[in-house]
Amino acid sequence: MPEATGLMAHNWGFAIFLLGVVGLCAFMLGVSSLLGSKAWGRSKNEPFESGMLPTGGARLRLSAKFYLVAMLFVIFDIEALFLFAWSVSVRESGWTGFVEALVFIAILLAGLVYLFRVGALDWAPEARRKRQAKLKQ
């Protein structure tokens, strides 16, 4: 029974900590809204550029290729994280873990080859059109 009492005391401590964090956040937000400036005007809504007049628009149109590269980076980066976790425990996982890692790497390589074949990694639109025409033949 003493273990349950210790566990209960630990949980109460965590609950008090969470209440303290929420209370502190609410206090800081409340004080900043009460003491902060409330002046609204045309100049308040403009972006601040170190005292210089703004030049150009703030919205830049980026090509969809950049988003594709970012998504591919995130996907392969997370997969590399899984491989790193496997490499830390390679001795404990034995041969079955090694075979599973090889299957995982093979799936990664198959996905990379597929992306290359479809043309997702091509920057030039002409090369993509040529590759898709070859695939259709």
Swiss-Prot record:
Upper taxonomic lineage: Bacteria, Pseudomonadati, Pseudomonadota, Gammaproteobacteria, Pseudomonadales
Membrane topology, record value: Multi-pass membrane protein
Principal localisation: membrane
Pfam families, sorted: Oxidored_q4 (PF00507)
Organism superkingdom: Bacteria
Gene3D superfamilies on file: NADH:ubiquinone/plastoquinone oxidoreductase, chain 3
Name listed for the protein in its UniProt record: NADH-quinone oxidoreductase subunit A
Family per record: Belongs to the complex I subunit 3 family.
Swiss-Prot/TrEMBL keywords: Cell inner membrane, Cell membrane, Membrane, NAD, Quinone, Translocase, Transmembrane, Transmembrane helix, Transport, Ubiquinone
GO molecular function: NADH dehydrogenase (ubiquinone) activity; NADH:ubiquinone reductase (non-electrogenic) activity; quinone binding
Function summary: NDH-1 shuttles electrons from NADH, via FMN and iron-sulfur (Fe-S) centers, to quinones in the respiratory chain. The immediate electron acceptor for the enzyme in this species is believed to be ubiquinone. Couples the redox reaction to proton translocation (for every two electrons transferred, four hydrogen ions are translocated across the cytoplasmic membrane), and thus conserves the redox energy in a proton gradient.
Assembly information from the UniProt record: NDH-1 is composed of 13 different subunits. Subunits NuoA, H, J, K, L, M, N constitute the membrane sector of the complex.
Entry EC no(s): 7.1.1.-
Catalytic activity, reaction form: a quinone + NADH + 5 H(+)(in) = a quinol + NAD(+) + 4 H(+)(out)
GO cellular component, one term: NADH dehydrogenase complex
Organism listed in the record: Pseudomonas fluorescens (strain Pf0-1)
